[in-house]
Design a protein with these regions (language model features):
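Glycine-rich nucleotide-binding loop
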Residues: 102, 124, 156-163
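Conserved short strand/loop->alpha-helix "switch" segment adjacent to the catalytic nucleotide/phosphoryl-transfer site
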Residues: 37, 55-84, 91-101
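ATP phosphate-binding glycine-rich loop and adjacent ATP-lid/helix-beta elements
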Residues: 127-154
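Short C-terminal beta-strand
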Residues: 106, 159-170
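Short beta-strand/loop element within the Bergerat-fold HATPase_c
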Residues: 100-112
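Short acidic helix/loop segment immediately C-terminal to the autophosphorylated histidine
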Residues: 1-10, 32-33
C-alpha cells in the first residue's frame, strides 16, 4: 500500500512537470518569436493542469487573481516550473486526510520587480521536519538563477504562503 502511494506520487509529479512543459510550449507557439507572453494565460493553463491531477476525494479549489505580468520567453519556463512545484506541493501536503481547502495564486506587477504568491489554507508545515524532497531547492535556485529574484515562505496553522519575486522583462539584462 505504501509503495503504491509512493509510486503514484512520483508519477503525479512527473505528469505535472510534463503538463507544465506542454503548456509553456503551447503558449509560446501561439506568440511571435521574442514577444512577451501573458503570465495569467500561463497560470490559467497550469491551474487547469493541477485540477486534472486532483482525485475525486480531494476537494481543493484553485483561484487566480491579480495583474497580468508580461513574461519574456526566457522567464516563462522558469515561472512554470516554480508555480507547478508550489501548487503541486500544496495539493500533496497541505490538505491531509481529505481535508477541504483552497489554493490561491496571485500576481502583482512592479516597475523593477514583480511578485507571484501561492497561498493555501491548509495545515501548514514545519520546515525543519518537512520531507527531504528537492522541489523547494529547485524552486529557490530557479527563482534566483533564472528570474533574478527571491523565494520566501510563511507558514502556520492557517496555511502556507510562498512568494517569489522576479525582475520585470525590461530589467532582465541587468
Amino acid at each position: 500500500q505504501c509503495e503504491q502511494a509512493e509510486s503514484r506520487a512520483v508519477l503525479e509529479a512527473a505528469l505535472s512537470k510534463l503538463l507544465s512543459i506542454v503548456s509553456v510550449h503551447d503558449i509560446l507557439s501561439r506568440g511571435r518569436a521574442g514577444e512577451s507572453v501573458s503570465c495569467l494565460s500561463l497560470l490559467h493553463a497550469l491551474a487547469d493542469n493541477a485540477r486534472q491531477l486532483l482525485s475525486e476525494s480531494q476537494h481543493i479549489s484553485i483561484t487566480l487573481c491579480g495583474d497580468d505580468i508580461p513574461l519574456s520567453p526566457e522567464q516563462m519556463p522558469a515561472v512554470a516550473i516554480v508555480i507547478s512545484e508550489l501548487v503541486t506541493n500544496a495539493i500533496r501536503h497541505a490538505f491531509p486526510g481529505g481535508r477541504r481547502g483552497h489554493i490561491s495564486v496571485s500576481c502583482m506587477a512592479g516597475l523593477r520587480y514583480s511578485f507571484i504568491m501561492v497561498e493555501d489554507d491548509g495545515a501548514g508545515y514545519d520546515p525543519h521536519t518537512a520531507s527531504d524532497g528537492n522541489g523547494i531547492v529547485i524552486c529557490s535556485s530557479t527563482v534566483e538563477e533564472k528570474l533574478h529574484g527571491t523565494l520566501q515562505f510563511r507558514t502556520g496553522p492557517a496555511g502556507t504562503c510562498a512568494v517569489f519575486s522576479m525582475l520585470t522583462p525590461a530589467h532582465e539584462t541587468e
